[in-house]
Amino acid sequence: MPSLLSLYRKILFGRKPGWDQQPLPTIYVQASNVMLSQEKIRQYAEVCGFEFDGVTLPPTYLYVWAFRLHATIFTHKAVTFPLLGMIHLKNSISVFRPVRSDETLTVQCELSDSRNTDSGLEFDLVSKVSVADELVWQALSTYLYRIDTPGRRARPPKASEMAWQDVKQWRLTEDLGRRYAKASGDYNLIHLHPLLSKRFGFERVLAHGMWSKARALSQLMTFIGDKPFQVDVEFKLPVFMPSEVTFGFESIENGKRFEMRDVKGRRPHLQGNVTYL
């Protein structure tokens, strides 16, 4: 399995000519005989709010490993635009059974589809994790390489009309991104320190979108238990740190709907659904 630090060196310091206005080809990568670290799992569970019993993985943890293959694809010569110009729009994870921390895994990732949109180039990365020949976990991530369109203004997203249950309020400290990076191995500079995020146009450090998804899902695990399920999220407004956010959910047919919002409960950062398979 490739090191994210070495991949980020290529991503940050390698030169890309820019998007050539062409769809992307299919790109496939695989890592076999992947073994997990109990210590890293515990760190991840702690920073994301999961209870780790030493056996069953937090459902979002395997994304940490899938993203290493995503980063490998991002360094492919056919990807002619920089990683730092991309936006993670949405993510779907399907858990077909609980995965044990001592299992040997095969992780596959494929850039499967790309399409031109008014906002730029959208593309999908499909990730699969297998134990022997059994598919146990799958994810679909949709990214956007955005292009600026003169005169085009995006409307800010609005929170949904949701009957919140058991509303939580969380304080996100400025060092959250560094703690998540240590646990996940994902050292994207915009999540680490204000001095680094300012280099990319952000006055404050941003929370990682997949941390937000994991933190939200950790609050719903008492309902999910060991059932097979799918969790879909759309990433809305960025979360700057330090800050406070609110989280709530409601019951829907065959699952839960949830949101992470600003402290006033008006502006959405994350919207998602859990459905049982």
Residue ranges and their predicted role:
Residues 31, 138, 228-230:
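Hydrophobic residues on conserved beta-strands that form the core of alpha/beta folds
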Residues 65, 114, 130-132, 201, ...:
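Short, surface-exposed, charged/polar-biased interaction segments
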Residues 1-90, 150, 154-223:
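Hot-dog-fold acyl-thioester-processing enzymes
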Residues 195-246, 250-252, 260-265, 271:
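Catalytic-pocket segment enriched in acidic/His residues
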Residues 1-24, 71, 86-172, 241, ...:
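HotDog/MaoC-like acyl-thioester-processing domains
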